[in-house]
Design a protein with these regions (language model features):
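Conserved short alpha-helix immediately C-terminal to the canonical SAM/SAH-binding motif I
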Residues: 139, 168-169
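Glycine-rich acyl-CoA binding loop
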Residues: 131-143
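Non-catalytic substrate-recognition and accessory regions of acyl/acetyltransferase enzymes
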Residues: 1-130, 145-160, 164, 170-206
């Protein structure tokens, strides 16, 4: 468990299950509603627990104390993935140089390939008593801090994520230090998302 300066408590879902048990945990998750993204709801309620057990992704629940009770505000999920960045990606020279330092260039693919932390899910709970207790930027920064802590142990400097091709979403991530570098076609099981591809964004963590 991690408590930051803003009195936000981060708990790994696996730890929460062990402490509170399956029934209380599932009741908590069932009451979560991201409001704007059904995929975020679906992952938390049907996949997060299994992904944690199999070591595919770690999910962190974010709480705060509200009127003497713990209030479930949000969650995020992290995983490790191989990210492919094309050599002709429209990114700055500075970012390209940093990517070159931490990746392998594959001539046949004409791409940089590196193992990187992925923020797979990020969602606020709009069923919370006061949704203003955490902002989207604060939640994103919590996820990035968790990645940075992991990198202190295992190495690495980058984190990436994918989002729908929605201008407001892309602007949000860019304002929070991410840079657009590519697009990925949706998999067959990604049926709750709009469009035919996801926009990929990356950030260098100092």
């Amino acid at each position: 468990m991690t408590m930051n300066k803003s009195k936000l408590l981060e708990v790994n879902l696996r730890d929460f299950l062990e402490i509170r048990g399956e029934e209380k945990t599932h009741n908590l998750l069932d009451n979560f509603d991201s409001k704007y993204n059904e995929d975020v709801n679906y992952f938390l309620k049907t996949k997060a627990e299994e992904f944690g057990k199999r070591g595919l992704a770690s999910t962190y629940l974010v709480f705060t104390k509200y009127k003497e009770k713990l209030e479930f505000l949000a969650y995020y999920s992290l995983a490790m993935k191989a990210v492919v960045i094309k050599s002709d990606a429209n990114i700055s020279k500075t970012l390209r140089k940093k990517i070159n330092t931490y990746s392998n260039f594959e001539p046949k693919l004409k791409s940089y390939v590196m193992s990187c932390h992925l923020i797979g899910q990020l969602g606020k709970n709009y069923n919370a008593n006061d949704e203003s207790l955490i902002s989207g930027s604060e939640l994103l920064e919590l996820a990035c801090r968790k990645v940075r802590a992991a990198q202190e142990i295992s190495g690495g400097k980058f984190v990436y994520l994918e989002c729908e091709n929605v201008k407001s979403l892309i602007n949000f991530y860019e304002k929070n230090g991410f840079t657009k570098f590519g697009m990925r076609k949706l998999d067959k099981e990604e049926t709750d998302l709009n469009g035919s591809y996801l926009v990929q964004l990356i950030r260098y963590l100092k």
